Amino acid sequence: MMYHIPGVLSPQDVARFREHLEQAEWVDGRVTTGAQGAQVKNNQQVDTRSALYAALQNEVLNAVNQHALFFAAALPRTLSTPLFNRYQNNETYGFHVDGAVRSHPQNGWMRTDLSATLFLSDPESYDGGELVVNDTFGQHRVKLPAGDLVLYPSSSLHCVTPVTRGVRVASFMWIQSMIRDDKKRAMLFELDNNIQSLKSRYGESEEILSLLNLYHNLLREWSEI
């Protein structure tokens, strides 16, 4: 399943990020990809050795960790270190699949269950640059407002179309979920959403408490901690 997570960053935060990123050192984006991806990748990324990068990636982690909808959809166990990329002048990233495992500075290795893109450019400011994701439900084309994030299974083939006008800037990361299986994770997300909707409409009740008990028992049964 694919999820749109709105408002991860406020407009003020986005403007500040963009101001900092205009001063950043950018390097060839192929430095962080494998052999297959390097053949179709043509973009730039912020140099991860810079102090500016360290500060910005911490802010992204804090923002997603504090976003209730992100947590409910991803049920994250481990988040990768966020990276930042830039596309301009017809730069693109052809169809590829993300690696199943990635190195992690604290945990050694992590499994990539979900991929996330946090948009930092207003969609009207550039042409092209759509994230195209192929999954079992078909093809999805994504171009979200700045500050919004999209979550999708890392097992999906995906690409970024050429940016023919303007500049597309984004942050991206991977998530190892407590729930490995996409279908089980989607069911928990739907159940959680319905519980929250019922609570807001009717308040607390024995029936809602029973559903909440079911949610946590399923999470206990399926989670990998």
Curated annotation (Swiss-Prot):
Record keyword Metal-binding present: yes
Ligand binding (2-oxoglutarate): 168
SMART domains from the UniProt entry: P4Hc
Amino-acid positions noted as binding Fe cation in the UniProt annotation, renumbered to this chain: 96, 98, 158
Gene Ontology terms for molecular function: 2-oxoglutarate-dependent dioxygenase activity; iron ion binding; L-ascorbic acid binding
PANTHER family, A to Z: PKHD-TYPE HYDROXYLASE YBIX
Record-given protein name: PKHD-type hydroxylase YbiX
